[in-house]
Swiss-Prot record:
A single GO molecular function term of this UniProt record: indole-3-glycerol-phosphate synthase activity
EC number assigned by the record: 4.1.1.48
Pathway linked to the protein: Amino-acid biosynthesis; L-tryptophan biosynthesis; L-tryptophan from chorismate: step 4/5
NCBIfam families according to UniProt: PRK00278.2-1
Species of origin: Thermoplasma acidophilum (strain ATCC 25905 / DSM 1728 / JCM 9062 / NBRC 15155 / AMRC-C165)
Catalytic activity: 1-(2-carboxyphenylamino)-1-deoxy-D-ribulose 5-phosphate + H(+) = (1S,2R)-1-C-(indol-3-yl)glycerol 3-phosphate + CO2 + H2O
Name of this protein: Indole-3-glycerol phosphate synthase
Principal EC category: lyase
GO biological process: L-tryptophan biosynthetic process
Keywords for this protein: Amino-acid biosynthesis, Aromatic amino acid biosynthesis, Decarboxylase, Lyase, Tryptophan biosynthesis
InterPro entries referenced in this protein's UniProt entry, alphabetically: Aldolase_TIM, Indole-3-glycerol_P_synth, Indole-3-glycerol_P_synth_dom, Indole-3-GlycerolPSynthase_CS, RibuloseP-bd_barrel
Family: Belongs to the TrpC family.
Amino-acid biosynthesis in keyword set: yes
One Pfam family from the record: IGPS
Length: 237
């Protein structure tokens, strides 16, 4: 997976306005969960990933399943080449009314506008790959549109490019997007709303770090391995 090629392609992608509702804050949804003593769960849909996962489940079936559970939001992969996603998936997902993260490699503020037009409520800014100037533009444009930003990192050195904001969530991705290997948990940085991403499944969910405000989980939910039900039954979410 060539990250530079993905960014270059995303700079040429666009989406005309087709959202059907106002934005719904993902950050606020997680805060509300935390206020009730729970963690916010972001349920992710993807058709495939470079790590080797793939599914034949269509997005409508997935949405019907997860909306019956306590989720704070949805993460929808919209990158077409490596994840077989599209802005069409975002538009479909935003109709159920929960916050939608457009999970993609946002290269600039123009991509934010397309994510908004498609129906997104939040975008992803990957600190490991973006210059701080672009992160700041993404945060500002998102705020203008009423959207949130998950500023994600894998390498702690990337945190020097972190841009604070009232619409910002800090996410730690345990997966290295270059090597695609999943690393061990790190010491959680101090921030008011934080999420843990990648590698949470039924085999390790009992040990999940409860210091995080929320979790982003995709593969294990798509596999129906019981992780979602475990989190719900034990009132973690």
């Amino acid at each position: 997976m060539n990250i530079e090629d993905i960014f270059a392609n995303n700079r040429t992608r666009s989406c005309e306005y087709r959202r059907e509702r106002r934005t719904v804050s993902l950050r606020r949804a997680i805060e509300l969960c935390n206020g009730e003593g729970r963690r916010g769960l972001i349920a992710e849909y993807k058709r495939r990933s470079p790590s080797g996962f793939s599914t034949d489940e269509d997005i409508s079936s997935y949405l019907s399943y997860v909306k019956m559970h306590r989720i704070a939001g949805l993460s929808i992969l919209s990158e077409p080449t490596h994840f077989s996603g599209s802005f069409d998936d975002v538009t479909l997902a935003h109709r159920i009314g929960v916050p939608v993260l457009v999970k993609d490699f946002a290269p600039d503020d123009h991509f934010v506008e397309s994510a908004y037009n498609a129906g997104g409520d939040a975008v992803l800014a990957i600190l490991d790959f973006l210059p701080s100037e672009d992160v700041e533009r993404i945060v500002r444009r998102s705020a203008d549109l009423g959207m949130d930003v998950i500023e994600e990192y894998h390498d702690r050195k990337a945190l020097k490019k972190f841009v604070d904001g009232d619409n910002v969530i800090l996410g730690y991705n345990r997966r290295d997007l270059v090597s695609l290997k999943t690393g061990e948990d790190q010491d959680m940085p101090q921030y008011d709303i934080t999420i843990l991403e990648s590698g949470i499944n039924i085999d390790n969910v009992v040990h999940v770090d409860m210091r995080y405000s929320g979790f982003l989980i995709g593969t294990s939910i798509l596999k129906r391995d019981g992780t979602l039900e475990y989190l719900e039954k034990n009132r973690i979410i």
